[in-house]
Regions:
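Signature of long, low-cysteine stretches enriched in small and polar/charged residues
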Residues: 98-150
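Generic solvent-exposed, charged/amphipathic alpha-helical segments
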Residues: 93-101, 178
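Glycine-rich phosphate/pyrophosphate-binding loop shared by adenosine-nucleotide-utilizing enzymes
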Residues: 156
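Residues in well-ordered beta-strands of folded domains
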Residues: 79, 130, 159
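A short acidic-to-branched-hydrophobic micro-motif
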Residues: 64-95, 142
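N-terminal targeting sequences that direct proteins away from the cytosol to non-cytosolic compartments
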Residues: 2-9, 16-71, 81, 111-121, ...
């Protein structure tokens, strides 16, 4: 599983780097919840804003990963593992955070983060992480939310990340995904 997290790090760092630029010029659009799109494949389904795109979707019996981008630079990551081999949410979030903090960003850095447990919502356990991404002297505070729950025989992890100033535009989309995520009909 560590290899899978490492593979995501490069993609995420590119998003972070671009995100700092976008955040400086406030290019994030609000999540468009009118006529949401629907993902229904690989035993799961969920709705997501019509102005967001799934940019990666890979699935094996051991690992399922979906990477989604907003119109700005916020991201959503879905990962699932067989529940009998999945890590706890605490371990998963710490490992993910450490990998991101240790990864080098050209002309910048990610600050040490703070992780804290948040109340359970929609059946998901949660951990919130706050950190700063700094590039060429511009520091942008970010929030990453880790959520987890068992769906069928899989342990599902959702990761929602956005600049704190973009939370009002992205949170409705994050909530739509969280609240509609379920096992596909007929699975």
């Amino acid at each position: 599983m560590v290899k899978k997290l490492s593979a995501l790090c490069l993609t995420l760092l590119i998003s972070f780097w671009g995100g700092c630029y976008d955040e400086t010029f406030d290019l994030t659009e609000a999540a468009d919840l009118t006529e949401p799109k629907e993902y229904n494949s690989n035993q799961i389904s969920f709705k997501y804003p019509k102005n967001w795109e799934i940019s990666a979707d890979s699935n094996t019996t051991a690992f399922h990963n979906i990477y989604m981008q907003t119109q700005g630079e916020a991201i959503v990551i879905y990962q699932s593992y067989p529940s009998d081999v999945a890590e706890s949410l605490t371990t998963f979030s710490k490992d993910f955070s450490e990998k991101m903090t240790q990864t080098e960003i050209p002309m910048g850095e990610i600050s040490q983060s703070e992780l804290k447990t948040i109340p359970k919502v929609a059946g998901f356990e949660g951990i919130e992480e706050t950190f700063d991404i700094s590039i060429i002297g511009i520091s942008v505070p970010h929030k990453r939310i880790f959520l987890s729950k068992k769906i069928a025989d899989r342990q599902v992890f959702l990761i929602f990340q956005a600049a704190i100033e973009d939370q009002p535009q992205t949170e409705p989309g994050f909530n739509l995904i969280r609240d509609t995520l379920k096992e596909s009909e007929g699975s």
